[in-house]
């Protein structure tokens, strides 16, 4: 009875009143104090007076500004970035940006422009990036650009422009990007291209224009960083038209909704009279490939043949011996040996990702690629009972291997012995079966990144990660520890150089306070989406300055003794936890408000208890934890009763003692 009465009095003693201060007013979000503001989609028809004059970056898209003039932004003289996407702008009057001398980037995307004054852009002296995408213009002459000598990129996609000819006096000396994708350009003349002569290493995007003709000599001696003719059906026109040009990257891919046309070897003859380092031919149809199909590709460094319906490459291909990077993704190979790897002795990067048929790795199919550094075989339905030394024979210089999203792989001891130089190994979403007690990774002394997420790996073995002295990043997301606990002795203890540890979605319920003691270099720990309570925070007491993600756990009350551990971290995420917002958690709530700069996703860090404050942001809660009147009353009653009982007890004791003298 006595304990029950005591509890009752203690509850009454600490009855508290709670209140939440919230604001429902829509206003711009401050991203950087006095400098960067987001006012998107607020239905505004003018610049809010609350924005300081010191504003430098303003995101103002999805508002309503039918007309802008010289008074619209006049006081924001420090603007360097202005986004006016979909603001229903029709008219841009004289000297609209006359006060914005420092304006660097102007975005006018998706505004139905009718009029733009000749002096509309006369103010900015350092304008570098202009976006006129989907504005309905039919000619570049619509934009007054004659004074923009600092312009580096101009985006004009999704309009009705039929010629790329730039206006007379258009400054191109510093122009690096000119984007005309999805317009109505079908012919390129010498006159068109002559207006680009002053631009060096330009990236010209004509994707989605279906070029039907190029005047002979239009690209003579031209030098481009990149050219994009994506969606053009007649590749013969392109290769003939680019004669005598020099191009770093040439993009000639097509789209899925276009009719497949066979590419004959004659199409590529024009390549013999131009210089190209990288070509993308994705989604074209190669019906028959002979040994001479690529004979004009002799200087090529990179070739992308994604989704080109290939099921086999013949041996003895001419012209690809110097190729460094080859992409054969989304094709129809059944066995890795069908790519005839001996055709590419200089290859350093190979990607066969998302093969449309189950890919058999075979034995030694890539052994001629002794210079290979990166290999991507993800999403290929690969399955093998003995991975991976026979399959990766002679790849001693391989540094990156991606086998993610495949079928079950069985790993023996030193499963990657043929690849001792590996620095990155990705086995995510591939079920792994470790056959031996010893680690399958133990010879990978240079491995820095290991992704084992959702691999259904048995993590109970303490030797699982032996032999990985250089490992810095380990992702174990979606794997389960025995009984949902990480014990003092565990498989992670040998990873002394680990910096990033991901243990999200691991169904963890507890972590021993000494589980991570040997992991002294960690700076990023993700424990989100588990069943952890605040007691597991003790396991991080030896770490300082880390990013700590505790989102979506079962943390309710954080005791005062744990607050110093949180205080010494760089960034903390506590969103979607059932946080207690009563006086029982008052010390944490006070700490939370004092350390907002450390906290991430504060908009989703909400109270769960008491019901009155459920769904309220912690930052908006103010508790008054002083003793309530009813508490004082019960305290007085309790003290009076206690005093009376004490008096009677003393009196009884003295009487008993007197009687027994």
UniProtKB/Swiss-Prot annotation:
This chain's source organism reads Mus musculus (Mouse)
Please list the residues annotated as glycosylated: 34, 53, 70, 78, 201, 244, 288, 394, 402, 451
Domain (LRRCT) ranges = 577-627
User: What is the name of this protein?
Assistant: CD180 antigen
Q: What is the protein's quaternary organization? A: M-shaped tetramer of two CD180-LY86 heterodimers.
The leader peptide range reads 1-20
Tell me if 4Fe-4S is a UniProt keyword of this record.
no
Q: Which SMART domains does this UniProt record tie to the protein?
A: LRR_TYP, LRRCT
Q: What does this protein do?
A: May cooperate with MD-1 and TLR4 to mediate the innate immune response to bacterial lipopolysaccharide (LPS) in B-cells. Leads to NF-kappa-B activation. Also involved in the life/death decision of B-cells.
What family classification does the UniProt entry report for this protein? Answer: Belongs to the Toll-like receptor family.
Q: Which PANTHER family match?
A: TOLL-LIKE RECEPTOR, TOLL-LIKE RECEPTOR 4
């Amino acid at each position: 009875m006595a304990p029950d009465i005591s509890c009752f009095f203690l509850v009454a003693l600490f009855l508290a009143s709670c209140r939440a201060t919230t604001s429902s007013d829509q206003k711009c979000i401050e991203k950087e104090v006095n400098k960067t503001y987001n006012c998107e989609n607020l239905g505004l028809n003018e610049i809010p007076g609350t924005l300081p004059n010191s504003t430098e970056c303003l995101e103002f898209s999805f508002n309503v500004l039918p007309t802008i003039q010289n008074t619209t932004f006049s006081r924001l003289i420090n603007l360097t970035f202005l986004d006016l996407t979909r603001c229903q702008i029709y008219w841009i009057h004289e000297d609209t940006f006359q006060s914005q001398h420092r304006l660097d980037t102007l975005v006018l995307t998706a505004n139905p422009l009718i009029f733009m004054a000749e002096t509309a852009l006369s103010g900015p002296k350092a304008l570098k990036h202009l976006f006129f995408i989907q504005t309905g213009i039919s000619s570049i002459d619509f934009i007054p650009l004659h004074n923009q000598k600092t312009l580096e990129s101009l985006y004009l996609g999704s309009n009705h422009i039929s010629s790329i000819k730039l206006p007379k006096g258009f400054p191109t000396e510093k122009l690096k990007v000119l984007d005309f994708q999805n317009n109505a350009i079908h012919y390129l003349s010498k006159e068109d291209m002559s207006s680009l002569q002053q631009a060096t290493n330009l990236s010209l995007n004509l994707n989605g224009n279906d070029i039907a003709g190029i005047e002979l000599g239009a690209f003579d001696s031209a030098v481009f960083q990149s050219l994009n003719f994506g969606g053009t059906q007649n590749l013969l026109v392109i290769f003939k038209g680019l004669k005598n040009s020099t191009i770093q990257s040439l993009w000639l891919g097509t789209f899925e909704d276009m009719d497949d046309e066979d590419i004959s070897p004659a199409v590529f003859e024009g390549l013999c009279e131009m210089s190209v380092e990288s070509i993308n031919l994705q989604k074209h149809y190669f019906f028959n490939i002979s040994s001479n199909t690529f004979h004009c590709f002799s200087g090529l460094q990179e070739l992308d043949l994604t989704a080109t319906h290939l099921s086999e490459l013949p041996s003895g291909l001419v012209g690809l011996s110097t190729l460094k990077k080859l992409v054969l993704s989304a094709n129809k190979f059944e066995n890795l040996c069908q790519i005839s790897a001996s055709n590419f002795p200089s290859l350093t990067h190979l990607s066969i990702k998302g093969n449309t048929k189950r890919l058999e790795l075979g034995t030694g199919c890539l052994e001629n690629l002794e210079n290979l550094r990166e290999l991507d075989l993800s999403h290929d339905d690969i399955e093998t009972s003995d991975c991976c030394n026979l399959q990766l024979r002679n790849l001693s210089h391989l540094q990156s291997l991606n086998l993610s999203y495949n079928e079950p792989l069985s790993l023996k001891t030193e499963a990657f012995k043929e690849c001792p130089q590996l620095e990155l190994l990705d086995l995510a979403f591939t079920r792994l079966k470790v056959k031996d007690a010893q680690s399958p990774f133990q010879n990978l002394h240079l491995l820095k990144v290991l992704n084992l997420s959702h691999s259904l790996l048995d993590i109970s073995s303490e030797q699982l990660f032996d032999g990985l002295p250089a490992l810095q990043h380990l992702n174990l997301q979606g794997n389960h520890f025995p009984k949902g606990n990480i014990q003092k002795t565990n498989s992670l203890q040998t990873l002394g150089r680990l910096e990033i540890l991901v243990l999200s979605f691991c169904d963890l319920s507890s972590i021993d306070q000494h589980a991570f003691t040997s992991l002294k270099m960690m700076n990023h720990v993700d424990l989100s989406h588990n069943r952890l309570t605040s007691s597991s925070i003790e396991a991080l007491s030896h770490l300082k300055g880390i990013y700590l993600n505790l989102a979506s756990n079962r943390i309710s009350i954080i005791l005062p003794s744990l607050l110093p551990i949180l205080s010494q971290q760089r960034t903390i995420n506590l969103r979607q936890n059932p946080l207690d917002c009563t006086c029982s958690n008052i010390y944490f709530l006070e700490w939370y408000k004092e350390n907002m700069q450390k906290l991430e996703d504060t908009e989703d860090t909400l109270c769960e208890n008491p019901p009155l404050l459920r769904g309220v942001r912690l930052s908006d809660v103010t508790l008054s934890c002083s003793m309530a009147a009813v508490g004082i009353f019960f305290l007085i009653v309790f003290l009076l009763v206690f005093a009376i009982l004490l008096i009677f007890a003393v009196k009884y004791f003295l009487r008993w003692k007197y009687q027994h003298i």
